[in-house]
Amino acid sequence: MNNMLLKTTALLTLFLSSAAWADAASELQQRLSKVNVLSADYAQTVSSSDGKNVQQGSGTLKIKRPNLFRMDNKTPQENQIISDGKTLWFYDPFVEQVTANWVKDAVNNTPFVLLTSDDSSHWAQYNVEQKADTFTLKPKAKQSNIKQFDIRIDSEGVLRNFSTIEKDGQTNLYILRNITNQPLADGIFKFSVPKGVELDDQRQK
């Protein structure tokens, strides 16, 4: 009898947890869908696992629903992350290298693309919890490099900040400023490999 009670309690707990995750994910997607286009500057703070600030940075963010995303990091080192909806490009001018991944394969390690995604297969890779205006996403795959992705967005769809916590405990916080919602051309989210730059094409693997 006790075993049966324990099993029933465990199943009920699992069911309620799954329902809570589904509700939180639905609420987050609903809030994100309220803003179709966004441009902003961001201030980045990188902190070690013990909470010490180890680096400050800045850059610009552009998103356009559905599935278009661009981050241009300006300081302390230039790099770009661009999603054209199918391919996620990571360009590091310093080492003259571009890495290309299919978006569907990159979501697990690059949750930024969820900010513009309405693809259920992308969202299915994360459990989502909500506490007021902060949503915490945790990847289901154990091999993910990301431990946690937090998004702070209000009920009107205004994105305030987001952060990642990596497996080693390092935190990357991005605080948005100078937010505008002016139209953006799709061409902004296109990427061509610069001449002389090495392409690491993970789409072929």
Swiss-Prot record:
Belongs to the LolA family. The keyword Lipid metabolism does not apply. One of its GO terms (biological process) is lipoprotein transport. Monomer. PANTHER family: OUTER-MEMBRANE LIPOPROTEIN CARRIER PROTEIN (PTHR35869:SF1). The lineage of its organism: Bacteria, Pseudomonadati, Pseudomonadota, Gammaproteobacteria, Pasteurellales. GO terms for cellular component: outer membrane-bounded periplasmic space. Residues 1-22 form the signal peptide. This is Outer-membrane lipoprotein carrier protein. Participates in the translocation of lipoproteins from the inner membrane to the outer membrane. Only forms a complex with a lipoprotein if the residue after the N-terminal Cys is not an aspartate (The Asp acts as a targeting signal to indicate that the lipoprotein should stay in the inner membrane). Gene3D superfamilies: Lipoprotein localisation LolA/LolB/LppX (2.50.20.10). It is found in: Periplasm. InterPro entries: LolA/LolB/LppX, OM_lipoprot_carrier_LolA-like, OM_lipoprot_carrier_LolA_Pbac. Keywords: Chaperone, Periplasm, Protein transport, Signal, Transport. Pfam families: LolA (PF03548).
